[in-house]
Amino acid sequence: INGKIGLPMSVTSIGAYAFAKTACTDFSLPDRVTEIGEGAFESCYEFQNLRLPRDLKKIGNRAFNDCLLSGGLDIAYNVTEIGDSAFYGCTGLDKLSLTSSLQRIGAYAFSGCKYLNCELAIPSSVTEIGDGAFQNCIYLNGNLILPANLKKIGSKTFENCKFFTGTLVIPNSVTEIGQDAFSDCSRFTGLSLPNNLRKIEFGAFARCINLTGRLSIPETVKEIGSYAFYNCTGFTGDFVLPSALESIGTDAFANTQNKNRLVFQSLPKGMQNGYHDCKMRRYVNLSDASYVSDDAYAYLDGASYVRTMTNTWGSLVLPYDMLLPSDAPYSVFTIEKMTNDEVVLKRCTFILNPGVAYIVRRDGEEKTLTFSPDRSVEIRMKMQPTDVGNLKFSGTYQAKEVTDGYILAQDRFWNVAKLKAAAPETQAVMVGPFRSWLEGTTANTSPSL
């Protein structure tokens, strides 16, 4: 089949591979056609001019894959779905207009349409954009506006779209940014990440060399993949990693050239490998997320300290002495012995003294623990009318940098020297309020505040 083909007005669908690999140059598609099937016009190398039918609702997978289409492409008003690889490799297209009824753009739908030379307006109705949907659409330009209801940005979705500009704002509905999703998008100048983001995968923003300003990673992020921000050389200021971070991949911040600090607020898996070759000073700031719901209150004629612990183990400092109840749902320990290799605890059975750092273990399922004296005590603290951090007292416990000894965090004793050895350029560990550390490495060393 070759030349120009006209179809009867009664035709309402084009079947799978109906005209694949034919030499037709032009098709007249009736307006009553509602669906174009899988591969219907695949590899029609002579097919150049395309006008989509008025009533079209669905464009199947690979429908126009590898066609030599030219000029602009207007997606018909009623289309709700563009299938996987539907226009893959249509290198002759130079303009693209998407309809407001569109809901899904399939994987690699426009991948390799490298001469599209226009702004990309993705309708707000779109909830799914597949992997590689606009990969290697090199000349797409202007600001990229992503739809507000988008849930996930897949792997390689906008990889190598080199001419997008301005600030990339990822909507708050997005929880995951896929592998190489924006890698080599080298003309973006700003980045705003969503408040509900959980995961940034391998190479997601690699080589986005013109991103500038301070990188703000949301507190909800639990995983940052290898090379996620590789060669992002324009960022300034500290990189403060979220306290919820559980895993960081190899070289996640490699070659960033940033001369400020890379600040860890947790001890994620892979932290010793997460920043090879970057120029920043490494810094650990352990803020104990287990204690965010602490509530301390006191009176001249009595006192009580209520603590919510999500971890089994924690550190404990009281501003008053307290007789340990025999039926307490927790156990309290002092340090019996401490060496480079071990910490030996000794259980307390009678009185806890004020201002001493103890180790507390939650013994049951109850997470809210109450530490109250059996008599009236005087609390020598200045009470504030509003919370200071999550405490109702200020000036009682100080955050401090430590360079040796042990830290109690995430139900483990962490040897500071070994922690620094795993990341040789780490300067210090920051110990926050309600966090004790154990100085030195000799036996019978007392905990410190």
Question: Residue spans of the language-model regions?
Answer:
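Short linear interaction motifs
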Residues: 337-346
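Leucine-rich solenoid repeat scaffolds
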Residues: 230-296, 300
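Structural signature of tandem-repeat unit edges
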Residues: 1-13, 23-35, 45-58, 68-81, ...
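A short, polar beta-strand/turn micro-motif
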Residues: 268-328, 346-449
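Consensus positions within tandem repeat domains that build extended binding/scaffold surfaces
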Residues: 15-18, 37-42, 60-63, 83-88, ...
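Tight coil/turn sites that cap or link beta-strands
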Residues: 17, 39, 108, 132, ...
